[in-house]
Each structure stands twice: as structure tokens, then as C-alpha cells.
Amino acid sequence: MNESFSAFVRVLTAVLWGPHVLLLILLAGVWFTLRGRFMQVTKLPGMTRGALCGTQRCGGFSAFQSLTASLAGSLGTGNILGVAAAILVGGAGAVVWMWIAAFFGMMTVYAEGVLAAKFGTKNAPGAIGYVQKAFGRHGAKIYAAGCVLSALGMGTMAQTGAASSVLVPMGVPRVLAGVVFAGLLLLCVRGGLPKAVRVTEKLVPFMAGLFLALCAAVLLLRGSHIPGAVRNMLKGAFSLKAGAGGVCGMILAMRESISRGVFTNEAGLGSGTFATFRTENKTPEQIGTLGALQVFIDTILLCTITALCMLVSPVRDFSPEAALSVFSLVLGRFGKLSAGVCVALFAFASVLAWSCYGMDALLYLLPKKGAAEKRIYMAFTALSCFLGCMSPFLGVLNVCDAFNGLMALLNVPALLVLTPQVFAKQIAQKPKKV
């Protein structure tokens, strides 16, 4: 029975989250890059200032709150453990594949943000709004169901499972880790996304700053090895090893490994739009810019710095379980403990954001949207946190990969169908030929 179920899960995952889906996501990014005339190079840097300035809001979120909330969802354990897995499988050259995927992914997430701002509503929030516009209510319901299942699996169980695998060797019992994660989640998410955003706007800068400080210390102490690390990254980018391990290098950046399925910038899933579409006093184009900035910070900045730390360190075992040894060998016990805290914070931030995304999606599916339904959902989310810490089951996580694929297979085609809406302002401003 178990073997039959495992075989079914493998087939389901291969269909919904195989290389063809990752290729679809990457090609969508290429398409939007060409349609936008490489906006992520020519226009987005200048648009970022306008997108971030101003903090006034009337019931919605400020631009900074939206950015930190979307970063909370994407800055999971994959930013540390996932990068280690990428290098383990694809060598130093896999980092370049992550850059390529992120470069095109910036425009995919830009398109998601623009369309969510145009079509997202209170009753059909975020990506659900534009999926409904493209494929009707039935298509939107399938997408929302995938989002709920991904929130319970990848957004909670996979994150806490990966975090516990790091915390347990440091002396933290699995039960204690599970209880703390679940308890903090229930405490922070009782008010829904608005309350969660007030947490993430403080938590994300703190945890990112702490992690960057650790990485800076490693790079300062091992600075003489940086040129060699960069050289290895560029030389290995198109080697057979990097190609085999990093084909559609996105898979290496998005997932820590098959056993943990931890993703990073979430380009193609539409998940970050649940936070960004609520941004007050911003145009759709500015909201799209926030999404593109999220991908840049997540992958181009943080994942690259993580990779450099690993490549300049004396560590040669880049398995996720040994990832923190990079910090312990260079910075001692303090470095390992601090890195462990970062992993726990990254995991919790992702759990907090995804639990709210899942709640929004669930409320779209339910005809009755009462407090009881919210409490039941949060109980299941807390249970998922606890179970993830206790035992990160491979079969469950493979199913979660399939849920991600379910989201992408509806989200990306919806983006392509609505492409004219993404660049409507750009087309309108194009001067007519006389």
C-alpha cells in the first residue's frame, strides 16, 4: 500500500512539478523580459524609488510593509540550506544559473504584481483575482486550493522540518521546536495578514541584517579566497555538472533538495501578490516593481552572498545538514549558533506569511467566511508546523511539490493570457507615428 502510494506521489509530482513546469516558468520570464524591453535593467532601478517612497496608508499596507511581507514568504530556509544543495548538486556554477533564473523571474513577478493590483479584490485577493479574470471562477478555485495545500505543506511543514534538522544537532528537542513554532504562529497570526505584516516589517530587516552581518564577517576573514570563488562560479556555469545539477537552475534555488522542497523567490507561483496587492497609494506598475525588487533581494543579493560564504570557506561538504559548518569553521561556535538562529527566523517568517496566504485562499473557496472557519484553518496550520518539526516525511513533501506545480500551471498561463494588461500603460504611452 505504501509503495503504491509512493509511486502515485512520484508520478503526480513528475506531472505537476517536473522540468517542463520549471521550463514554463523560465520561458515566461524570458517572454515578459522581451515584452518589457529588459525593464529590469532599463527602468526598474529608477522605478524602485517611486515604489518605496511614501508611508501613508488608509487601511492597506505601506510599500515597505508589502515588500517585507512578500520577502517573509520567500526568505525561507532555502536561502541558506537550499543554496548549499544547489552547490552540492551543480557545483559553483549553479550560482550563475540562479542569477539567470532570478533575472528573468524578476519580470514574471513584476507581471504578477501589476495584474494583482488591477484585478485583485477583497473577495478575490492577489493572484486569485487575475486567475479568475483569465480562466473564470472554476480555474481560480483550483489555484486557491493549490495555494491552501502549499501553505500547509511547503509553507509550514517543509520550513519547520528544515529548521528542526538544523536545531536538533544544536541540542533543541524536536517537540520543543514544534511547540514554539506553532505557538508563535498562533500568537502572531490571530489578526490575519494585517497583524502578521506588523510583525514581518520588524522581523525581516532584523533577520536579514543579522544574516548579512554573519556573511560579511566570513567574507572579511576569507577575503583572499573571493576571487577564486567568483572564478569557479563563472567557469563552472556551463559545465556538464552545473548543467545536470542546475538545469533550469531555478530548481536548485527554489528547493533545498528533493527531501525538503524548500523554495526561494517563488517566481511563477503568484504567492507574493497576496501581500503586495494591498499596497496603498501606488500604481499597478509600482506594485509590480515591489515584486521584482523582492526577487532581486532574495536571490541576487542574499543567495549570492550565501553562496560566496560557502565557496570561500574550507568546507567541502555542502549537504544541507552540514551547511552551518561554514559559519562554525570560520566564526566558531558563535557563528554556528547565530546561523542556526537565522535559519529558525527565516523559517518562521515564511510560515507566518504563507499561513496568511493560505487563509486568504481558503476564504475564497468557502461560501461562509466566519471566525470558526479561520480558527479551524489556523489549528491545521499550527499542527503542520509541529508535524514538520517532528518528522519531515519525504512522501508528504513530494506531494507539496505537486501543490506548487498546481499553482504554477494556472498562474503562469493566466499571466500569459493577460500579457496586454501587464504592459497596457507602456503601450498607451508609446508615441504614435505621424
Predicted regions, residues:
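Transmembrane helix-loop junctions in multi-pass membrane proteins
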Residues: 36-40, 78-83, 92, 153-164, ...
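Alpha-helical membrane segments and immediately flanking helix-loop junctions
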Residues: 57-89, 122-128, 148, 247-296, ...
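N-terminal alpha-helical transmembrane segments of multi-pass membrane transport
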Residues: 1-77, 88-93, 105, 220, ...
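Membrane-interface helix-loop-helix modules in multi-pass membrane proteins
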Residues: 65-124, 132-136, 288-315
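Membrane-interface loop-to-helix entry segments
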Residues: 24-35, 39-48, 161-167, 172-222, ...
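Flexible loop linkers connecting adjacent transmembrane helices
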Residues: 38-61, 85, 91-95, 107-135, ...
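Extracellular/periplasmic helix-exit of transmembrane alpha-helices
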Residues: 110-119, 216-232, 244-245, 277-281, ...
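Helix-loop-helix module between adjacent transmembrane segments
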Residues: 31-33, 71, 101-121, 128, ...
